Structure formats: structure tokens, C-alpha cells
Design a protein with these regions (language model features):
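Short, glycine-/Ser/Thr-/acidic-enriched flexible segments
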Residues: 62-64, 99, 149, 157, ...
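Active-site-adjacent helix-turn-beta-strand microarchitecture at beta-sheet edges
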Residues: 104-237
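Zymogen propeptides
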Residues: 21-164
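A short catalytic or substrate-binding loop motif that flags glycine-/basic-rich loops and adjacent residues
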Residues: 47-51, 133-136, 209-210, 238-242, ...
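Short glycine-rich loop/turn motifs
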Residues: 52-56, 139, 213-215, 243-247, ...
């Protein structure tokens, strides 16, 4: 009898876990023409009892007919639609980096054709009794190599470097009384022992063809582990606030997942917390993933057509950088 009860309880919990996952519907027909290894899905199920709308695109990384790249503009911002026109109408276009309204510059790394074209911000002034102190976080990014392998890492990437330094296992957070910071502040031994540091998961030559930054990291080794405090992205309990979201991740079988979540439409689409966002990506099989700039910036175009409705009343918010998937030119 006890064994039967245990089996019934186990079945109940498994059934509930399966039912808790969101139902995604293929909506390729709404965004044609699409190549074979690229698909679009939509979800309108309630999320934890609240109205929810989201889309994700799935692309096979090894497909030579797909080109994964990025674009950025200097000291200004333009709408995703303008980026779409500027880039010869790519298959997919999505916002990515956080940015400064004062300078219009990205606050996160962008790598285009193997070159750093935007950089992380590694110094944050403290306030109150710590006015003369500074915190120095690393920034997270998702990259795709020439061999079409994806990776999520925390990076030191300022304008003094040709290549970003990747911290694969954990983020570092420094605090001192100096505004300026260098790679040797994070890894003093890097200059003399680069091979040893690589064994510790620190790579001073992160060779990515394309990368875009954001944060915080949401998934590590297939588990939800949100490094918000280490990356200093959202203050206090903001990790559980619901907002529009943009995020990216990848699976062990070589699929890139690009997701946008609609929000700030009461009773229609109320957004997601970082924890909910991480769970959605985990349920889709992602092993590593990170959050990108969200809120009014969240926007994904498929063949130039909007997926979610942007939350800004003016429509698409101008941004300084985007991630793109293009149809590769015929050889």
C-alpha cells in the first residue's frame, strides 16, 4: 500500500511539473519566408496565474546558411527598424545591451567580426558613507565563435584590450578607492601564468566572432543561478519585479534561443521576473543563458515584423546595439 501511495504521489508531482511548463506554439507561418533551421514560437499561457505573452526564435548554430552577427552605432541610438533597414533586412533582429541615456553609449560589450566595438563599464561609484569608494563588476555576455559554438561568460573588456578576458566559472566583484581598474586588478597572476589561469577558468583570449553583453547571467550548467548581486544589475528586490524581457541562451544540441517577453500591459501581458525568465529558458533546454536589456527596449523583429508589442507608448525605443541573424550569402 505504501509503495502504491508513493508511486501515485510521484506521478502527481511529475504531472504537475510538466503541466507547469508553458505551451509554445509554432508560428512560422506568420513570419515567412524562413529557412529550414530557423523557427519562431509564441506563448499566451498564463505565467504563474498572470497574463503572459512571449516569443522565442530558435536557430541551429551549425547551419552555414545562417550568419550570427551584431551591429552598433557610435554615440547615438536608432530604432530596431532603422537597424533592420541599415543591415539589409536580416532574418532576426533583437535589442541587446544596456545603455546610457546621457551618452547614448552601450554599457556592455559588443564584438563584431571578432573585434571589440563596445566595452563593459567596470566602475560604479558608491554613495553615502562609501562616497569615495568604487565597485568594479565584470559584465556578462553571450558569444558565438567562428566554429559556431556558443558560450556565456563574465568578461573584463575595456578599450585597452584587443580581446575580452573571460571568467567562465564565476564573476568577480572588486571594491576599492580607485576609479580606474585594469585586468591585473582582477587577475594579478595573468601576466606571468596565463596557462595556469586558463585551468582556473580564466581565459585572456576569448575568441568570439560575435558577442553581445547584458546581464545578469540566468543559467549555469543547466541550473538557475542568477548572478545579479555580483554583476550589480538590479538593486534590492528588483530581481523579482516583472518587466518586459529580452534574453538569450543555448542548448547542448546546438540551438540558439532568443526570447522576448511582453510586459507592462496590465491584464494583457504583465512581463516576467528574472527567476521566471530563467525557468522559461531552462524548460526549453538551455544550459547557459543571460538576461539582456529589457523594459521599453525589448523588441524582436522577424523579417522586419514585430513579435511582442514594445511597452513604450512611442513604440520602438532607440537603442545603440542589436544582435542579428542573417541569411548567409550563397558561396
Amino acid at each position: 500500500m505504501k509503495k502504491n501511495i508513493f508511486v501515485l504521489l510521484l506521478f502527481f508531482f511529475i504531472a504537475n511539473a510538466v503541466m507547469a511548463q508553458q505551451k509554445w506554439v509554432n508560428v512560422d507561418t506568420a513570419f515567412q519566408p524562413l529557412p529550414n533551421n530557423f523557427h519562431v514560437f509564441k506563448c499566451t499561457d498564463n505565467l504563474d496565474g498572470k497574463p503572459f505573452i512571449a516569443y522565442y526564435a530558435e536557430a541551429k548554430l551549425k547551419d552555414q546558411q545562417l550568419d550570427f552577427t551584431a551591429d552598433t552605432v557610435k554615440d547615438r541610438r536608432i530604432t530596431p527598424l532603422k537597424f533592420y533597414e541599415r543591415n539589409n533586412q536580416p532574418l532576426l533582429l533583437v535589442n541587446c545591451t544596456f545603455f546610457s541615456y546621457a551618452t547614448n553609449r552601450s554599457l556592455n560589450v559588443v564584438i563584431k567580426e571578432g573585434k571589440l566595438v563596445a566595452f563593459n563599464t567596470h566602475t560604479i561609484p558608491m554613495r553615502g558613507k562609501d562616497t569615495f569608494q568604487y565597485k568594479h563588476p565584470l559584465g556578462s555576455a553571450i558569444g558565438i565563435s567562428k566554429k559556431r559554438r556558443a558560450d556565456v561568460a563574465w568578461l573584463f573588456a575595456d578599450s585597452s584590450l584587443k580581446r575580452a578576458i573571460a571568467f567562465e566559472r564565476k564573476p568577480y566583484l572588486l571594491q576599492d578607492s580607485f576609479y580606474l581598474v585594469s585586468k591585473f586588478d582582477f587577475v594579478p597572476e595573468l601576466h606571468h601564468f596565463p596557462k595556469r589561469e586558463k585551468r582556473r577558468g580564466i581565459n585572456d583570449n576569448w575568441k568570439m566572432k560575435t558577442a553581445v553583453g547584458g546581464g545578469p547571467v540566468l543559467l549555469q550548467n543547466g541550473a538557475i543561478k542568477i548572478t545579479n548581486n555580483e554583476e550589480l544589475k538590479f538593486a534590492g528586490k528588483a530581481i523579482e519585479d516583472k518587466h518586459p524581457r529580452t534574453c538569450m541562451g543555448y542548448t547542448n544540441d546546438g540551438r540558439l534561443i532568443v526570447m522576448v517577453i511582453q510586459g507592462r500591459f496590465s491584464g494583457i501581458a504583465e512581463g516576467a521576473t528574472l527567476t521566471q525568465e530563467a525557468q522559461l529558458l531552462k524548460d526549453l533546454g538551455c544550459v547557459e543563458a543571460l538576461n539582456l536589456d529589457g523594459g521599453g527596449s525589448s523588441c524582436m523583429l522577424i523579417n522586419g515584423k514585430e513579435t511582442i508589442k514594445p511597452s513604450d507608448k512611442e513604440g520602438e525605443r532607440p537603442v545603440p546595439a542589436v544582435f542579428l541573424i542573417k541569411k548567409a550569402p550563397n558561396p
